Amino acid sequence: TMTSLASCEEAENANWNFCLELPDPDVEFNHNTVKNSQFLQPLFEFSGACAGCGETPYIKLVTQLYGDRMMIANATGCSSIYGGSAPTVPYSVNKKGFGPAWANSLFEDNAEFGFGMNLATTQRRAKLADTVEKLIAVEYCDADLKAAGKEWLDNMDDAEGSRKAADKLIAELNASVDPDLTGTPYEKDWLANGKKCVCEACTLGREVLANKDLLVKKSQWIFGGDGWAYDIGYGGLDHVLAQDQDVNVLVLDTEVYSNTGGQASKATPTGPIAKFAAAGKRTGKKDLGMMAMSYGYVYVAKVCMGADKNQLMKAITEAEAYKGPSLIIAYAPCINHGINMGKSQEEAKKAVEAGYWPLYRYNPDLAKEGKNPFTLDSKPAKTDYKDFIMGEVRYASLKKLFPAVADQLFDRAEKEAENKYEYYKKLSELDSVSYTHLRAHETRSNL
Protein backbone atom coordinates (compact mmCIF):
# COMPACT_ATOMS: atom_id res chain seq x y z
CA THR A 1 0.00 0.00 0.00
CA MET A 2 1.03 3.60 -0.54
CA THR A 3 2.58 5.37 2.47
CA SER A 4 3.64 8.97 2.97
CA LEU A 5 7.24 9.91 2.15
CA ALA A 6 7.74 11.41 5.60
CA SER A 7 7.00 8.10 7.31
CA CYS A 8 9.77 6.20 5.52
CA GLU A 9 12.25 8.85 4.39
CA GLU A 10 14.51 8.73 7.45
CA ALA A 11 14.84 4.94 7.47
CA GLU A 12 15.43 4.72 3.72
CA ASN A 13 18.03 7.50 3.85
CA ALA A 14 19.90 5.45 6.44
CA ASN A 15 19.72 2.37 4.22
CA TRP A 16 20.94 4.35 1.22
CA ASN A 17 23.87 5.84 3.13
CA PHE A 18 24.80 2.36 4.37
CA CYS A 19 24.92 1.11 0.78
CA LEU A 20 27.15 4.00 -0.26
CA GLU A 21 29.61 3.17 2.50
CA LEU A 22 30.04 -0.46 1.47
CA PRO A 23 33.64 -1.08 0.34
CA ASP A 24 34.50 -2.07 -3.20
CA PRO A 25 35.76 -5.65 -3.62
CA ASP A 26 39.46 -5.47 -2.70
CA VAL A 27 40.55 -8.18 -5.07
CA GLU A 28 42.06 -8.31 -8.54
CA PHE A 29 39.86 -10.05 -11.10
CA ASN A 30 39.12 -9.97 -14.81
CA HIS A 31 36.50 -7.27 -15.34
CA ASN A 32 35.91 -8.15 -18.98
CA THR A 33 33.19 -10.74 -18.43
CA VAL A 34 29.45 -10.25 -18.12
CA LYS A 35 29.36 -11.35 -14.49
CA ASN A 36 32.50 -9.60 -13.27
CA SER A 37 31.68 -6.32 -15.00
CA GLN A 38 28.69 -5.96 -12.70
CA PHE A 39 30.94 -5.76 -9.63
CA LEU A 40 32.20 -2.43 -11.00
CA GLN A 41 30.53 0.83 -9.99
CA PRO A 42 28.33 2.36 -12.70
CA LEU A 43 29.29 5.97 -13.33
CA PHE A 44 26.01 6.59 -15.15
CA GLU A 45 22.97 6.31 -12.92
CA PHE A 46 19.40 7.58 -12.41
CA SER A 47 19.00 9.15 -15.84
CA GLY A 48 15.75 10.75 -16.93
CA ALA A 49 15.38 8.50 -19.98
CA CYS A 50 12.10 6.76 -20.79
CA ALA A 51 11.38 3.73 -18.63
CA GLY A 52 12.79 0.68 -20.41
CA CYS A 53 15.00 2.77 -22.71
CA GLY A 54 17.21 0.53 -24.84
CA GLU A 55 20.06 3.05 -25.00
CA THR A 56 20.97 3.64 -21.35
CA PRO A 57 22.06 0.06 -20.48
CA TYR A 58 24.87 0.31 -23.04
CA ILE A 59 26.11 3.60 -21.59
CA LYS A 60 25.93 2.24 -18.05
CA LEU A 61 28.05 -0.76 -19.04
CA VAL A 62 30.70 1.31 -20.81
CA THR A 63 31.05 3.58 -17.75
CA GLN A 64 31.44 0.53 -15.51
CA LEU A 65 34.35 -0.65 -17.64
CA TYR A 66 36.10 2.64 -18.48
CA GLY A 67 34.24 5.44 -16.71
CA ASP A 68 37.02 6.58 -14.40
CA ARG A 69 39.25 7.45 -17.37
CA MET A 70 36.84 8.09 -20.23
CA MET A 71 36.07 11.24 -22.19
CA ILE A 72 32.74 11.48 -24.01
CA ALA A 73 31.64 13.62 -26.94
CA ASN A 74 27.85 13.28 -27.08
CA ALA A 75 25.76 14.13 -30.14
CA THR A 76 22.55 16.03 -29.59
CA GLY A 77 19.60 13.69 -29.24
CA CYS A 78 18.06 11.50 -26.56
CA SER A 79 21.47 10.64 -25.13
CA SER A 80 22.38 14.31 -24.68
CA ILE A 81 19.01 15.15 -23.10
CA TYR A 82 19.03 12.45 -20.44
CA GLY A 83 22.83 12.76 -20.30
CA GLY A 84 23.21 16.45 -19.58
CA SER A 85 20.01 18.27 -18.64
CA ALA A 86 20.13 20.77 -15.77
CA PRO A 87 19.99 20.72 -12.81
CA THR A 88 21.43 17.20 -12.53
CA VAL A 89 23.36 14.82 -14.75
CA PRO A 90 23.50 11.01 -14.57
CA TYR A 91 27.28 10.86 -14.94
CA SER A 92 28.96 10.48 -11.56
CA VAL A 93 32.35 9.85 -9.95
CA ASN A 94 33.84 7.03 -7.92
CA LYS A 95 35.16 7.31 -4.36
CA LYS A 96 38.45 8.69 -5.65
CA GLY A 97 36.65 11.46 -7.50
CA PHE A 98 37.22 10.07 -10.99
CA GLY A 99 34.46 9.81 -13.57
CA PRO A 100 33.61 10.47 -17.22
CA ALA A 101 34.41 13.88 -18.69
CA TRP A 102 31.31 14.61 -20.79
CA ALA A 103 30.50 17.36 -23.28
CA ASN A 104 27.92 18.03 -25.99
CA SER A 105 28.52 20.24 -29.00
CA LEU A 106 26.01 20.14 -31.87
CA PHE A 107 24.04 17.47 -33.72
CA GLU A 108 26.05 17.73 -36.91
CA ASP A 109 29.65 17.92 -35.65
CA ASN A 110 29.87 15.43 -32.81
CA ALA A 111 32.35 13.09 -34.48
CA GLU A 112 34.66 16.01 -35.25
CA PHE A 113 34.17 17.26 -31.68
CA GLY A 114 35.27 13.93 -30.21
CA PHE A 115 38.10 13.72 -32.74
CA GLY A 116 39.35 17.11 -31.59
CA MET A 117 39.14 16.07 -27.95
CA ASN A 118 41.33 13.08 -28.71
CA LEU A 119 43.85 15.13 -30.70
CA ALA A 120 44.14 17.59 -27.83
CA THR A 121 44.62 14.83 -25.27
CA THR A 122 47.23 13.12 -27.45
CA GLN A 123 49.17 16.35 -27.91
CA ARG A 124 49.05 17.24 -24.21
CA ARG A 125 50.19 13.75 -23.17
CA ALA A 126 53.07 13.91 -25.67
CA LYS A 127 54.16 17.20 -24.09
CA LEU A 128 53.82 15.64 -20.62
CA ALA A 129 55.99 12.69 -21.68
CA ASP A 130 58.63 15.13 -22.89
CA THR A 131 58.56 16.85 -19.49
CA VAL A 132 58.95 13.53 -17.65
CA GLU A 133 61.89 12.62 -19.90
CA LYS A 134 63.58 15.92 -19.06
CA LEU A 135 62.88 15.39 -15.36
CA ILE A 136 64.47 11.96 -15.10
CA ALA A 137 67.44 13.20 -17.15
CA VAL A 138 68.34 15.72 -14.42
CA GLU A 139 71.52 14.38 -12.84
CA TYR A 140 70.58 15.05 -9.22
CA CYS A 141 67.00 13.79 -9.58
CA ASP A 142 66.05 11.27 -6.86
CA ALA A 143 66.68 7.66 -7.95
CA ASP A 144 63.20 6.46 -6.93
CA LEU A 145 61.65 9.34 -8.84
CA LYS A 146 63.70 8.46 -11.91
CA ALA A 147 62.54 4.86 -11.70
CA ALA A 148 58.90 5.91 -11.34
CA GLY A 149 59.22 8.28 -14.28
CA LYS A 150 60.74 5.61 -16.51
CA GLU A 151 58.03 3.13 -15.52
CA TRP A 152 55.35 5.62 -16.53
CA LEU A 153 57.03 6.34 -19.87
CA ASP A 154 57.16 2.61 -20.58
CA ASN A 155 53.46 2.17 -19.75
CA MET A 156 51.85 5.49 -20.70
CA ASP A 157 49.87 3.95 -23.58
CA ASP A 158 48.61 0.99 -21.55
CA ALA A 159 45.41 1.56 -19.57
CA GLU A 160 46.12 -0.44 -16.41
CA GLY A 161 49.88 -0.04 -16.68
CA SER A 162 49.62 3.75 -16.86
CA ARG A 163 47.25 3.79 -13.88
CA LYS A 164 49.65 1.90 -11.61
CA ALA A 165 52.68 3.82 -12.86
CA ALA A 166 50.85 7.13 -12.39
CA ASP A 167 50.13 6.37 -8.74
CA LYS A 168 53.83 5.65 -8.13
CA LEU A 169 55.00 8.73 -10.01
CA ILE A 170 52.60 11.05 -8.19
CA ALA A 171 53.68 9.63 -4.82
CA GLU A 172 57.36 10.15 -5.64
CA LEU A 173 56.73 13.67 -6.92
CA ASN A 174 54.81 14.64 -3.80
CA ALA A 175 57.69 13.34 -1.70
CA SER A 176 60.44 15.00 -3.75
CA VAL A 177 59.16 18.29 -5.14
CA ASP A 178 59.62 21.46 -3.06
CA PRO A 179 61.46 20.01 -0.04
CA ASP A 180 61.95 22.05 3.13
CA LEU A 181 65.14 24.06 2.55
CA THR A 182 65.29 25.67 5.99
CA GLY A 183 68.91 26.01 7.12
CA THR A 184 70.35 25.34 3.68
CA PRO A 185 72.25 27.74 1.39
CA TYR A 186 69.09 27.89 -0.74
CA GLU A 187 66.79 29.06 2.08
CA LYS A 188 66.72 32.73 1.04
CA ASP A 189 65.66 32.06 -2.56
CA TRP A 190 63.25 29.38 -1.34
CA LEU A 191 61.47 31.82 0.98
CA ALA A 192 61.48 34.56 -1.67
CA ASN A 193 59.66 32.21 -4.05
CA GLY A 194 56.92 31.29 -1.60
CA LYS A 195 58.73 28.17 -0.34
CA LYS A 196 59.05 26.84 -3.87
CA CYS A 197 62.35 25.41 -5.00
CA VAL A 198 63.51 26.88 -8.31
CA CYS A 199 65.87 24.05 -9.25
CA GLU A 200 65.30 22.34 -12.60
CA ALA A 201 64.03 19.09 -11.09
CA CYS A 202 61.42 20.75 -8.87
CA THR A 203 60.30 23.08 -11.67
CA LEU A 204 59.75 20.13 -14.01
CA GLY A 205 58.15 18.10 -11.21
CA ARG A 206 55.59 20.83 -10.52
CA GLU A 207 54.72 20.88 -14.22
CA VAL A 208 54.09 17.14 -14.17
CA LEU A 209 51.90 17.44 -11.06
CA ALA A 210 49.94 20.28 -12.69
CA ASN A 211 49.03 17.87 -15.49
CA LYS A 212 48.63 14.69 -13.44
CA ASP A 213 45.12 14.18 -14.82
CA LEU A 214 46.82 13.12 -18.07
CA LEU A 215 49.03 10.43 -16.56
CA VAL A 216 46.38 7.70 -16.91
CA LYS A 217 45.62 6.79 -20.53
CA LYS A 218 42.27 8.23 -21.60
CA SER A 219 39.50 6.26 -23.26
CA GLN A 220 37.88 8.52 -25.88
CA TRP A 221 34.24 7.77 -26.74
CA ILE A 222 31.81 9.36 -29.17
CA PHE A 223 28.12 8.73 -28.38
CA GLY A 224 25.12 9.38 -30.59
CA GLY A 225 21.95 7.99 -32.11
CA ASP A 226 21.19 6.80 -35.62
CA GLY A 227 19.86 10.20 -36.69
CA TRP A 228 23.34 11.55 -36.04
CA ALA A 229 25.45 8.60 -37.23
CA TYR A 230 23.47 7.57 -40.32
CA ASP A 231 22.17 10.98 -41.39
CA ILE A 232 23.03 14.44 -40.13
CA GLY A 233 26.49 13.67 -38.75
CA TYR A 234 27.48 10.93 -41.19
CA GLY A 235 29.93 13.07 -43.16
CA GLY A 236 31.87 13.91 -40.01
CA LEU A 237 31.67 10.36 -38.72
CA ASP A 238 33.07 9.02 -41.98
CA HIS A 239 35.90 11.56 -41.83
CA VAL A 240 36.82 10.54 -38.29
CA LEU A 241 36.68 6.81 -39.01
CA ALA A 242 38.98 7.40 -41.98
CA GLN A 243 41.69 8.73 -39.66
CA ASP A 244 44.09 6.67 -37.57
CA GLN A 245 43.05 8.10 -34.21
CA ASP A 246 42.20 5.81 -31.30
CA VAL A 247 38.55 6.76 -30.82
CA ASN A 248 35.54 4.59 -29.96
CA VAL A 249 32.14 5.36 -31.48
CA LEU A 250 28.96 4.00 -29.90
CA VAL A 251 25.86 4.33 -32.10
CA LEU A 252 22.62 3.83 -30.17
CA ASP A 253 20.42 2.65 -33.03
CA THR A 254 16.67 3.06 -32.45
CA GLU A 255 16.03 3.16 -36.21
CA VAL A 256 14.26 6.54 -35.91
CA TYR A 257 14.93 10.08 -34.71
CA SER A 258 13.70 9.26 -31.22
CA ASN A 259 14.24 12.58 -29.46
CA THR A 260 12.24 14.61 -31.97
CA GLY A 261 9.28 12.26 -32.11
CA GLY A 262 10.06 9.28 -34.30
CA GLN A 263 10.98 10.55 -37.76
CA ALA A 264 12.41 8.08 -40.27
CA SER A 265 16.19 8.01 -40.65
CA LYS A 266 18.49 6.10 -42.98
CA ALA A 267 18.64 3.52 -40.19
CA THR A 268 14.90 2.85 -40.56
CA PRO A 269 14.45 -0.45 -42.43
CA THR A 270 11.90 -1.26 -45.11
CA GLY A 271 8.30 -1.31 -43.91
CA PRO A 272 7.54 0.49 -40.64
CA ILE A 273 5.44 3.61 -40.27
CA ALA A 274 7.35 6.62 -39.01
CA LYS A 275 7.06 10.36 -39.42
CA PHE A 276 8.05 11.20 -43.01
CA ALA A 277 7.10 7.59 -43.87
CA ALA A 278 3.42 7.59 -42.98
CA ALA A 279 2.59 4.86 -45.51
CA GLY A 280 5.54 2.66 -44.62
CA LYS A 281 9.20 3.25 -45.44
CA ARG A 282 9.85 2.20 -49.03
CA THR A 283 13.65 1.98 -48.93
CA GLY A 284 16.04 -0.23 -46.98
CA LYS A 285 18.34 0.42 -44.05
CA LYS A 286 21.79 1.85 -44.70
CA ASP A 287 24.48 -0.72 -43.81
CA LEU A 288 26.68 1.59 -41.77
CA GLY A 289 28.82 -1.27 -40.52
CA MET A 290 29.77 -2.52 -43.98
CA MET A 291 30.54 1.02 -45.10
CA ALA A 292 32.98 1.40 -42.20
CA MET A 293 34.50 -2.04 -42.87
CA SER A 294 35.39 -0.99 -46.40
CA TYR A 295 38.33 0.97 -44.97
CA GLY A 296 39.86 -2.26 -43.71
CA TYR A 297 41.34 -0.70 -40.57
CA VAL A 298 38.20 0.25 -38.62
CA TYR A 299 37.00 -2.10 -35.87
CA VAL A 300 33.25 -2.64 -36.37
CA ALA A 301 30.69 -4.54 -34.32
CA LYS A 302 26.93 -4.93 -34.39
CA VAL A 303 25.58 -5.83 -30.96
CA CYS A 304 22.39 -6.40 -29.01
CA MET A 305 22.44 -6.58 -25.21
CA GLY A 306 19.15 -8.44 -24.89
CA ALA A 307 20.25 -11.19 -27.27
CA ASP A 308 23.90 -11.91 -26.49
CA LYS A 309 25.64 -10.23 -23.56
CA ASN A 310 28.86 -12.19 -24.05
CA GLN A 311 29.16 -10.99 -27.64
CA LEU A 312 28.48 -7.44 -26.44
CA MET A 313 31.27 -7.66 -23.85
CA LYS A 314 33.69 -9.01 -26.45
CA ALA A 315 32.82 -6.21 -28.85
CA ILE A 316 33.22 -3.42 -26.29
CA THR A 317 36.50 -4.70 -24.87
CA GLU A 318 37.96 -5.46 -28.30
CA ALA A 319 36.92 -2.04 -29.61
CA GLU A 320 38.44 -0.20 -26.67
CA ALA A 321 41.66 -2.21 -26.86
CA TYR A 322 41.99 -1.72 -30.64
CA LYS A 323 44.62 0.88 -31.52
CA GLY A 324 42.59 2.79 -34.07
CA PRO A 325 39.03 3.89 -34.82
CA SER A 326 36.22 1.60 -33.71
CA LEU A 327 32.47 1.61 -34.36
CA ILE A 328 29.89 -0.24 -32.25
CA ILE A 329 26.31 -0.24 -33.57
CA ALA A 330 23.93 -1.18 -30.75
CA TYR A 331 20.28 -2.17 -31.18
CA ALA A 332 18.18 -0.04 -28.85
CA PRO A 333 14.42 -0.74 -28.53
CA CYS A 334 12.51 2.53 -28.27
CA ILE A 335 9.11 3.72 -27.11
CA ASN A 336 8.58 4.88 -30.71
CA HIS A 337 8.52 1.22 -31.79
CA GLY A 338 5.21 0.71 -30.04
CA ILE A 339 6.29 -2.08 -27.71
CA ASN A 340 5.92 -2.97 -24.04
CA MET A 341 8.88 -1.03 -22.63
CA GLY A 342 8.89 -3.24 -19.56
CA LYS A 343 10.16 -6.00 -21.84
CA SER A 344 12.52 -4.06 -24.10
CA GLN A 345 15.41 -6.49 -23.56
CA GLU A 346 13.18 -9.44 -24.48
CA GLU A 347 12.10 -7.54 -27.61
CA ALA A 348 15.73 -7.02 -28.55
CA LYS A 349 16.37 -10.75 -28.17
CA LYS A 350 13.43 -11.48 -30.48
CA ALA A 351 14.95 -9.16 -33.10
CA VAL A 352 18.10 -11.28 -33.29
CA GLU A 353 16.26 -14.61 -33.17
CA ALA A 354 14.07 -13.53 -36.10
CA GLY A 355 17.06 -12.49 -38.21
CA TYR A 356 16.07 -8.84 -37.97
CA TRP A 357 19.33 -7.75 -36.31
CA PRO A 358 22.38 -9.96 -37.09
CA LEU A 359 25.37 -9.81 -34.77
CA TYR A 360 28.97 -9.63 -35.96
CA ARG A 361 32.45 -8.32 -35.22
CA TYR A 362 35.09 -7.12 -37.67
CA ASN A 363 38.54 -6.97 -36.09
CA PRO A 364 41.40 -5.77 -38.35
CA ASP A 365 43.93 -7.21 -35.89
CA LEU A 366 42.84 -10.71 -36.96
CA ALA A 367 43.81 -9.94 -40.55
CA LYS A 368 47.34 -9.13 -39.34
CA GLU A 369 47.46 -12.68 -37.94
CA GLY A 370 46.39 -14.14 -41.28
CA LYS A 371 42.84 -14.79 -40.12
CA ASN A 372 39.46 -13.70 -41.45
CA PRO A 373 38.69 -10.41 -39.65
CA PHE A 374 34.92 -10.92 -39.93
CA THR A 375 33.10 -13.04 -37.33
CA LEU A 376 29.36 -13.69 -37.61
CA ASP A 377 28.12 -14.12 -34.04
CA SER A 378 24.41 -14.80 -34.58
CA LYS A 379 22.79 -17.93 -35.97
CA PRO A 380 20.24 -18.15 -38.81
CA ALA A 381 16.74 -17.00 -37.93
CA LYS A 382 14.90 -19.51 -35.77
CA THR A 383 11.63 -17.59 -35.43
CA ASP A 384 9.39 -16.03 -38.06
CA TYR A 385 10.47 -12.58 -39.25
CA LYS A 386 6.93 -11.34 -39.86
CA ASP A 387 5.68 -12.59 -36.50
CA PHE A 388 8.39 -10.48 -34.87
CA ILE A 389 7.69 -7.24 -36.71
CA MET A 390 3.93 -7.61 -36.27
CA GLY A 391 4.55 -7.47 -32.52
CA GLU A 392 5.54 -3.81 -32.89
CA VAL A 393 3.00 -1.05 -33.53
CA ARG A 394 5.27 0.68 -36.06
CA TYR A 395 4.81 -2.34 -38.35
CA ALA A 396 1.37 -3.60 -37.29
CA SER A 397 -0.21 -0.19 -37.90
CA LEU A 398 0.80 -0.32 -41.57
CA LYS A 399 -0.91 -3.70 -41.92
CA LYS A 400 -4.06 -2.20 -40.41
CA LEU A 401 -4.07 0.93 -42.58
CA PHE A 402 -2.72 -0.39 -45.89
CA PRO A 403 -2.85 -4.22 -45.90
CA ALA A 404 -1.77 -4.69 -49.51
CA VAL A 405 1.14 -2.27 -49.17
CA ALA A 406 2.15 -3.91 -45.90
CA ASP A 407 2.24 -7.38 -47.46
CA GLN A 408 4.45 -6.12 -50.27
CA LEU A 409 6.85 -4.21 -48.02
CA PHE A 410 7.06 -6.93 -45.38
CA ASP A 411 7.87 -9.56 -48.03
CA ARG A 412 10.62 -7.32 -49.34
CA ALA A 413 11.94 -6.59 -45.84
CA GLU A 414 12.09 -10.29 -44.99
CA LYS A 415 13.95 -11.06 -48.21
CA GLU A 416 16.40 -8.22 -47.57
CA ALA A 417 17.11 -9.62 -44.09
CA GLU A 418 17.67 -13.13 -45.48
CA ASN A 419 20.00 -11.85 -48.21
CA LYS A 420 21.93 -9.76 -45.72
CA TYR A 421 22.49 -12.72 -43.42
CA GLU A 422 23.60 -14.95 -46.30
CA TYR A 423 26.08 -12.29 -47.38
CA TYR A 424 27.48 -12.01 -43.86
CA LYS A 425 27.68 -15.80 -43.65
CA LYS A 426 29.73 -15.98 -46.84
CA LEU A 427 32.08 -13.30 -45.53
CA SER A 428 32.58 -15.21 -42.28
CA GLU A 429 33.47 -18.43 -44.15
CA LEU A 430 36.23 -16.90 -46.27
CA ASP A 431 39.90 -17.29 -45.43
CA SER A 432 41.95 -14.13 -44.93
CA VAL A 433 43.31 -14.01 -48.50
CA SER A 434 39.89 -14.56 -50.09
CA TYR A 435 38.35 -11.92 -47.84
CA THR A 436 41.01 -9.37 -48.81
CA HIS A 437 40.49 -10.09 -52.52
CA LEU A 438 36.70 -9.78 -52.16
CA ARG A 439 36.92 -6.43 -50.39
CA ALA A 440 39.37 -5.15 -53.02
CA HIS A 441 37.01 -6.26 -55.81
CA GLU A 442 34.06 -4.53 -54.16
CA THR A 443 36.08 -1.35 -53.73
CA ARG A 444 37.03 -1.31 -57.42
CA SER A 445 33.43 -2.04 -58.41
CA ASN A 446 32.26 1.04 -56.54
CA LEU A 447 34.74 3.39 -58.21
What kind of feature is each model-predicted range?
Residues 5-16, 87-89, 95-139, 355:
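Flexible beta->alpha loop and helix N-cap segments adjacent to enzyme active/binding sites
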Residues 48-76:
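N-terminal amphipathic, basic-rich helices that act as targeting or association modules
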Residues 109-198:
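N-terminal leader/propeptide and maturation segments of large enzyme subunits in energy/redox metabolism
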Residues 87-101, 312-405, 412, 425:
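Glycine/aspartate-rich loop-and-adjacent alpha/beta segment that forms the canonical ThDP
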Residues 20-23, 27, 82-83, 199-326, ...:
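Thiamine diphosphate
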Residues 1-35, 98:
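Non-heme iron-sulfur electron-transfer modules
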Residues 436-443:
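Conserved small/polar residues in nucleotide/adenosyl-binding loops
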Residues 34-49, 104-119, 126-142, 214-216, ...:
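Conserved thiamine diphosphate
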